[in-house]
């Protein structure tokens, strides 16, 4: 049984879902933070179920929110261990949802924000079967130097970042696009001017 749960928006056409869209929220938020985006996407994907799980850990800086992993220590080994634990949890959740709905990775997309983008990229590029797409807002690649050896699939990726983001510098998205392109991954990045 998955450790993750959160809000769900069922298909608009009340049919059995043919697609799964999973939102991965940012540090200190929860699943409610992103599920509202489903209302804007659903008209184009009426046969999709939208899932927005809470990350697995309570957030150290915001006890009302959640985190995928703790980065406050600044210790790379501790952060990496947290990333790996969160990746296992997210992978298990994805597998459970795919099995529950009788779908495969090619019917799945991940949409992440900030730390959720970090997890979406980390997990999505290391799954044995390629998912339909990854969309990431205001994130970065975690341990990009390890990706070449860990890479198992190459889903198309679209990255968006504001050029005045106060938390994660937009250069992280530019660097991610460069690294992913070097690995022959179909990636596009958009830097939004005058946007956090």
Where do the language-model regions lie?
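Short beta-strand/loop motif that positions the catalytic acidic residue
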Residues: 158-161, 165
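Primarily recognizes the serine-hydrolase "nucleophile elbow" in alpha/beta-hydrolase
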Residues: 106-153
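Serine-hydrolase catalytic machinery in alpha/beta-hydrolase-like enzymes
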Residues: 2-107
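Conserved alpha/beta-hydrolase "acid-adjacent" motif
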Residues: 32, 166-172
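Short beta-to-alpha linker loops that shape the active-site pocket of alpha/beta-hydrolase fold enzymes
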Residues: 54-58, 140, 195
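C-terminal catalytic histidine-bearing segment of alpha/beta-hydrolase fold enzymes
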Residues: 174-196
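Short, proline-enriched alpha-helix->beta-strand connector loops that line the catalytic pocket
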Residues: 105-106, 152-157, 183-186
